[in-house]
A protein has these predicted regions:
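Flexible, solvent-exposed loop segments that connect beta-strands
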Residues: 34-48, 67-86, 109-128, 155-174
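Predominantly the C-terminal beta-signal and adjacent terminal strand-loop region
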Residues: 73, 132, 138-186
Length: 186
């Protein structure tokens, strides 16, 4: 028993020495959208996507929170429009060695507006949206990682109306987003 008690500190020291230390107490994530692909059949291809997703996670819990806001713009001969996505998410950082994996889900709203070529303003009803995303990151430095992400946004179809409240079209703002980002630990 005495041999065991005297060798216990040595064994614990060796075990702790081989386990990588996580020095970060808090990490901040920032992602930018690279592309957006609508899931609606026959939908126009977006001209641009802008915005960001920012998130915070604590070392104590593998959970984090994120907020994202994207603006997707479409231009055609007959109409210019944009959809604005605002989604709050919760994500979990998976304990995988060497790479950083995060899986998340969220909910929010999509608002749409547009203008016909003759100057008529269009508005779409607000659409409830859900979001699921995954990011895969690689640590470059001990407290810094770069990652790529894929996100699926499901939203309800909504009516697009003109200023006279006449339904002109139906819009499905659902789609997929590719993102790139960084994570900094503190």
């Amino acid at each position: 028993m005495i041999k065991f008690l005297t060798s216990l500190p040595l064994m614990l020291t060796l075990m702790l020495w081989t386990i990588p230390a996580k020095a970060e107490l808090l990490s901040v994530h920032a992602d930018v959208p690279l592309s957006f692909s609508p899931t609606q059949e026959g939908a126009d291809t977006p001209d641009s996507i802008s915005g960001a997703r920012v998130g915070l996670s604590l070392f104590i819990l593998p959970l984090g929170i994120a907020y994202e806001s994207y603006e997707v713009s479409y231009t055609s001969d007959s109409v210019d429009s944009k959809d604005t996505y605002q989604i709050a998410s919760v994500f979990v950082n998976l304990p995988v060695p060497v790479i950083n994996i995060a899986l998340g889900a969220g909910a929010g709203m999509v608002t749409g507006e547009g203008e016909l070529s003759n100057g008529t303003k269009l508005t779409a009803d607000d659409s409830a949206a859900t979001s699921f995303f995954a990011t895969l990151g690689y640590p470059i430095l001990p407290l810094f990682d770069v990652h790529a992400g894929y996100q699926v946004i499901n939203a309800n179809k909504v009516d697009v109306k003109d200023s006279s409240n006449v339904v002109r079209d139906e819009n499905d703002p659902s789609g997929t987003v590719w993102t790139a980002g960084i994570k900094l630990g503190f």
